[in-house]
Amino acid sequence: MRTMNNFLNWLFTLDHKRIGILYTLVGIWAGFLGLSFSIMIRVNFLEPYYNVISTDCYNFLITNHGILMIFFFLMPILIGGFGNFLIPLLSGLSDLNLPRLNALSFWLLVPSVIFLVTSMCLGAGVGWTFYPPLSSSLFSGSKGVDFLMFSLHLAGVSSIFSSINFICTLYSVFSVNLASRSSVILWTYLFTSILLLTTLPVLAAAITMLLFDRNFGSAFFDPLGGGDPVLFQHMFWFFGHPEVYVLILPGFGMVSHACLNMGCAPDVFGFYGLVFASFSIVCLGSVVWAHHMFTVGLDVKTAVFFSSVTMVIGVPTGIKVFTWLYMLLNSNVNKSDPIFLWVVSFIVLFTFGGVTGIVLSACVLDSVLHDTWFVVAHFHYVMSLGSYISIVIMFIWWWPLITGVSLNKYLLQCQCLVSNIGFNMCFFPMHYFGLCGLPRRVCMYESSFSWINMICTVGSFISIFSGCFFVFILWESLVSRHVALGSFGAASVVTNMILSPIAYHNNFFTHYLSVNYSYGVYHIYWKNNVYIGTWT
């Protein structure tokens, strides 16, 4: 009976912490499923002209690998998981403003996953970008493509509801004092929510038009009926490129927060620089979508505009990187600490991926490299490594607050070393592939590349081992019960006042709280208005 009650409590919970944990569990499951697909892809490249799996199955794998990793691994953990958990705590609230909408957002994700698994079974090999005419009924008649569209529709509605909830909650926080130097994490989640709310309806419209083309005889993207398939690319990438920043902005906030605490500083160095750099990235990132389309025949003026603005995005990103380096330079933290190693790994790998992005932003070079493995290497360094390392940093940082136990330092050091070796062995040689002209999305290749493909495959196995190793470290901490003695750092942040593990459905505050990093003064009240203490 107690087990059933606990199950029902989790099933019908409105608590932001439990919903965040549910999001995270779904994300971990999807992440390992996507990893298994990536291993099958890499195994297929062990032999140059012999396919371990059929070509149709290969198309199914690359389609579902991309969609799983982006929509069901990175977004649920970074936004649904840690966003749900951290926004109320860092804002001084007991929950999000719309808890029922929060629960609905999660439970829309479950049928979305079911539809995606159904599409896998029925077959949907249209690529994660599902461009027409390949995704039209003429060339992809399988009903699996329709289930894939429905899956993305539900995932999009879930994200829109979460974004509305986050914006309402953060508005109630910032409306008290807009000039408050609140946590950078809150600002990055606000910008992330604005990006999602702006771009997801455009993707939903594109998917709806494609469904009508496939099932009701319309011709939005069919040239024979007066449609334009390039229109779909514009609509898709109007969402697709800001999605990159949706996945990396929470990581920017977390790295800024970690650097602040490791420096034991009373305030973030260059706070307004970080916030306005994030805002600049949001604004610029929303108007550069066509740099994914340099090979479709854009006119010269359009290509030059999108190429130039893409290069400008490197400026606010550089402001962030140098701000983090300055804070790390002035920190007294042990340089062998796992959190320090991971933050440095994030800065180095993400910066390297950004530099290759500057290379691709030149429309002349992109025309040559667009359909090669160079692009695969670029977006894996930025999205896969940047966002994945953000998740690892968040787990290491907030695990004591969530569970009350700390992770094994020496195991984390080993895991960081193994991960970086695996990442770079897997993805760095892909730049060489691209410069040699090896085409992506093709499962056969010239035999002269077999030795370096072997290196990539070994690196992918090491990367998967590191992921499993990290889950083992989480499990080991729960079994060994290494009780956390305190939070990371000594900066004046409100989470340092909360007991760990944090209680279920505590009403911490009875009024909206303006959290000010500049002075670090917090007045904490329980629900019955009994004064607890002041942090100065």
Feature map (PLM): residue ranges:
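Membrane-embedded and interfacial regions of multi-pass energy-transducing membrane proteins
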Residues: 1-536
